[in-house]
């Protein structure tokens, strides 16, 4: 199916139908996977001048996150300041980077999005927000959708959704309601 065929009247990509046969037959040899993963830490790490480059790249992929029950606008502001300068200036100079690395985003609860957007103004660092009943995803769909709307209206550029894990454990893939959660909400 082409992208043109999946677009709706609102210009939204409608997604593709769920084909569980793509993964229903997949099997994992758990003991082999565990053995293989245990060897990952013994493998040769990135060395010398490549190490710094990969560490900088890791910083650029990280979302600095605060999802504490006692978050405050001040705590979020401090996190945003760290996001603007994730590496000490002397290290940036010593590495010859020529610029301060930028984190991928700052991620906060929906009620803290405005504080983060304000603190990051002019920095080009996007604000992400968890939504849809973090951390368990056990709230009704209308409430999860409203949480997304609230975060986007407050300035969130990215929404990290939480799925209802029971649907996965029970292999109820259509119960995940992912198409309902796609932005823009319908």
Predicted regions and their residues:
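Alpha/beta catalytic barrel-like cores
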Residues: 1-95, 104-105
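Short His-Asn-centered micro-motif
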Residues: 106-110
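Alpha/beta enzyme core
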Residues: 49-57, 70-101, 111-186
């Amino acid at each position: 199916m082409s992208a043109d065929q999946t677009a709706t009247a609102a210009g939204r990509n409608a997604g593709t139908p769920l084909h569980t046969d793509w993964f229903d037959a997949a099997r994992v040899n758990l003991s082999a996977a565990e053995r293989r993963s245990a060897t990952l830490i013994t493998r040769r790490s990135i060395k010398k001048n490549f190490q710094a480059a990969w560490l900088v790249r890791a910083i650029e992929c990280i979302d600095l996150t605060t999802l504490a029950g006692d978050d405050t606008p001040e705590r979020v502001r401090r996190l945003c300041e760290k996001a603007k300068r994730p590496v000490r200036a002397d290290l940036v100079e010593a590495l010859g980077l020529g610029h301060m690395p930028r984190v991928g985003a700052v991620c906060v609860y929906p009620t803290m999005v405005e504080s983060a957007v304000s603190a990051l103004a002019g920095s080009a660092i996007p604000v992400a927000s968890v939504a849809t009943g973090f951390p368990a995803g056990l709230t009704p769909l209308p409430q999860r959708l409203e949480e997304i709307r609230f975060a986007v209206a407050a300035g969130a550029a990215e929404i990290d959704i939480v799925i209802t894990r029971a649907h996965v454990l029970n292999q109820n893939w259509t119960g995940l309601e992912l198409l309902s959660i796609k932005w823009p909400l319908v």
